[in-house]
Amino acid sequence: MKARLSTKMVGESLEIHCETEFNRIRATAFPKAYFEKDNDTRTGSKGDYIFRDSDEADTEIVSIMFEMKNENDETATKKKNEDFLKELDKDRIEKQCEYAVLVSLLEPDSELYNSGIVDVSHRYKKMYIIRPQFFIPMITLLRNAAQNSLKYKTELAIVKA
């Protein structure tokens, strides 16, 4: 399939895959979530998707900027995941997202990236690199951690009062 696709189409096929996976479980797993393409280019750049979820009081509990990267096997100049982190961090900050996640099929032979969720927060705050199969688990982990954190903050506020 990849051989017939242009570079732009290969990248878009990864975006469509992730969007389809999310929409399959949206109604049951993320009923209040916002998950849309980032089409706002006023600041000069944009990520691919923004995920935001809120609690029952419509207080935002988590926000994630997603960038999806893929390339043809025949592409002459192979890009590395590292090449996209600075721009992703800039997009995360500009769009006021708490987390940034690079969903990538680049560097297909990398043991590091093939092993699971890679935390690159030592370079860029709250940033991760994942393969597409970890897309839904990553959203779930970050959202659940945020919900638990909110619960503890609420309990602490009650205790202090």
Label each residue range with its predicted role.
Residues L5-G11, E15-A161:
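Amphipathic, heptad-repeat alpha-helical coiled-coil/stalk segments that mediate oligomerization
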